[in-house]
Amino acid sequence: GQGAGLLMIIGGFVMSFVVRATAESSKGILAVFVFAGLMGGGLGPTLSAYLMIYSNGAAILAQALGVTGLIFLSLSGYALTTGKNFNFLGGFLATGMMVMLVAMIANIFLQIPAMSLAISGAVIMLMSGFILYDTSRIVNGGERNYIMATISLYLSIFNLFIHLLNLIGALTGRD
């Protein structure tokens, strides 16, 4: 259930440090697979909840997945075809993530639904920026380690999907 999903997400968080520590070795590949498996497994209970709670849960999941794919392909395609360097976004994105983490922690205690939606909207924009930034770094040679490149893009896509799911569910979900 939800407890197992939370443990898997926590395990994925721990594995993200293992991935960084092993990124320069062949063990890093195994660490990436374990990390992705834990994060995906942790996502399972959330997806199940959407299917059970909302009568249109399958449509919400499909929309979130489709929009995630569209955003990723559009932004990565733009960075690939133009070759533009988006390194200038780095400081803004890092600061934005720190602000969002503080806001998320605050909302755990405050439990304000509108704040949750605002956070999701901001995280969607931030993850879009990270996709541009990370793809640009890969294309322009700023990120030469394919393991770290994989993790960076995976986390951007994962978080983009989660927050699109939250936003679409709140706006179109029917009980």
Stretches with model-predicted labels:
Residues 1-175:
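A hydrophobic alpha-helical transmembrane-helix feature that marks the membrane cores
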